Amino acid sequence: MANWSCQDALKMYNVPYWGAGFFNIDALGRVVVTPDKTRLDCKIALVDIIEQLRKQGYATPVLLRFPDIIKTRINALFGAFEQAIQSYGYKGRYQCVYPIKVNQQNQVIESVTRAFADKPALGLEAGSKPELLAVLSHHHDLGSVIVCNGYKDREYVRHALLGSLLGHHVYIVVEKPSELELILDEAARLNITPRIGVRARLASQGSGKWQASGGEKSKFGLNAAQILRLVERLREADKLDCLQLVHFHLGSQIANIRDIQGGIRECGRFYAELRHLGANIEVVDVGGGLGVDYEGSRSQSHCSANYNLREYANNVVWGIGDVCAEFDLPHPMIISESGRAITAHHAVLISNIVGMESQLPTSLPDAPDAEAPMLLQNMWDSWKELHEKEDPGLLEIFHDSVSDLADVHTQYTLGMLSLHQRAWAEDLHLNLCLKLKVMLDPVNRMHRNLQDELNEKLADKCFVNFSLFQSLPDAWGIDQIFPIMPLSGLDQQPTRRGVIMDITCDSDGMIKEYVDGVGIENSLPMPEMRNDETNYMGFFLVGAYQEILGDLHNLFGDTHSAEVCLNDNGEPVITNIIKGDNVDNLLRYVNIDTSVIRRDYQKLVAHPSLSEETRKALLEELEAGLQGYAYLEDE
């Protein structure tokens, strides 16, 4: 393409659609972030931040957090609901609750609580005893909302009730029938009036990777008959007024707004029926599900969403309000647990490219001699047809070449062809694929599948200094798509494509799908790598679930992390730098005693053939290894 510009790069990587206004490309071809949308002129080049961290001794990979993005997302969510409430004349208020399971890192929870400072009240959700204790410690404002989900034992219930004594509005949501007796027993023992919620198991179900969270066979919630028994038990105990919240959850990352509409309507009916049964329901908790458009396609794909914040809020507010109008009921407070939508955009993983392995042929093999096997002659004939025929059948030529190459491999295994002949055939096939790729017409639908196949086949292997299993576990576990792109050189037209490999010893350690301007591709367009500088790759929208789900495959642990904030002058300030795991820590995680390792080193270097100077140098080197970063480091 002539006159390549950064606008072309934005389109190629689909940045305007998945970036949500936070990410852009500057005139120098660098990826920049605008974390605070009230200060659009404050743009931060990601490579500049990484270079500053390197000077301070922090090598990549590094996870960068932008707290201002969390604040911006919370403001946008509140704004969408406030506008919907005003538009529909809704009399209740909206309460955003952050479920900390999405990202329990202390810096993230602190960023969320700071962002709530000017909001009506802070809301946090816990799904386990450890999460509840963390949530209680982060609440400083009286009247803050705490939602207690998940399976519960007596201790969990007791801690939740004690939260009420601290002045918080703690809703203990009954997920299974047996939990109600625990709540009633502990509340009576502590002489505390509980706020009880019930999770309704809806027939409505979302679609996608997380659809099992909803529907009649979901792991959580009470069915209609169980809810009726719960109401009768509370009435019998004279505690029906304690039932104040009804909750449902269709699943995380709901892509289709119609699924949300159906769930809201069904939950609204539960609200209406419970009110008519005498329950003092004041809150409808619509759970999570608010999607993030990871691929920027605004579609029903499982990594996208065919709606925005405003449409989501409109459907929730209108749907509940419509049920209230139909049955002449008061408008309840609305809670949403939109953790993914709050945190996904705020974190970017950045690491260096450590190697490129080209799959392109370096030269064209010579024509086979007259005595060469017929199979090799046939392959050469396909090559000549591609060049000499006026209108060659491109698909047929490719299929013939693939078939011939398969026969070459078979005959080589049987000893009928030599290693030189196999290498000749493979080189010729690669040359043919490269020529075909140039000749294919991307507008021709018949050519598109082959174009994709050739892009993948001819793509470079791009080795990046990170662990997929530690930093992007959902890309491996559930094939989630994350936007990925080089952080510089984007003012140049991409000349090649790459497939990203991590540095684990696992063939699954590779990214299989990439966001592209025309859809999802199996390789990533890349500019030429510069040999005179470090080339960085950015992995975007990794702020939800990835850190806590990451594992220690090959003993690659947590990366360095840092927060980047804007000061009053609009300049970036790097704060809260946390060192990633060193080797010593990682060995201890798997119960390897590093003191024993050090003692064994002492024994090994005590060999009489080693001088005292050599022994000292060896021990220093081994100790440096134990204290070093688990990832690849520049000397």
Swiss-Prot record:
InterPro entries per UniProt: Ala_racemase/Decarboxylase_C (IPR009006), Arg_decarb_HB (IPR040634), Arg_decarbox_C (IPR041128), Arg_decrbxlase (IPR002985), De-COase2_CS (IPR022657), De-COase2_N (IPR022644), Orn/DAP/Arg_de-COase (IPR000183), PLP-binding_barrel (IPR029066)
Cofactor(s) listed in the protein's UniProt record: Mg(2+); pyridoxal 5'-phosphate
SUPFAM superfamilies: Alanine racemase C-terminal domain-like, PLP-binding barrel
Gene3D superfamilies documented for this protein: 1.10.287.3440, 1.20.58.930, Alanine racemase, Lyase, Ornithine Decarboxylase, Chain A, domain 1
Pathway the protein acts in: Amine and polyamine biosynthesis; agmatine biosynthesis; agmatine from L-arginine: step 1/1
Annotated substrate binding sites: 284-294
Modified residues (N6-(pyridoxal phosphate)lysine): 101
GO biological process: arginine catabolic process; putrescine biosynthetic process from arginine; spermidine biosynthetic process
Keywords: Decarboxylase, Lyase, Magnesium, Metal-binding, Polyamine biosynthesis, Pyridoxal phosphate, Spermidine biosynthesis
EC number annotated for this UniProt entry: 4.1.1.19
Top-rank taxon: Bacteria
Keyword Magnesium attributed: yes
Catalytic reaction list: L-arginine + H(+) = agmatine + CO2
GO molecular function, one term: arginine decarboxylase activity
Name of one Pfam family that matches: Arg_decarb_HB
Protein family membership: Belongs to the Orn/Lys/Arg decarboxylase class-II family. SpeA subfamily.
Function of the molecule: Catalyzes the biosynthesis of agmatine from arginine.
Protein name (Swiss-Prot/TrEMBL): Biosynthetic arginine decarboxylase
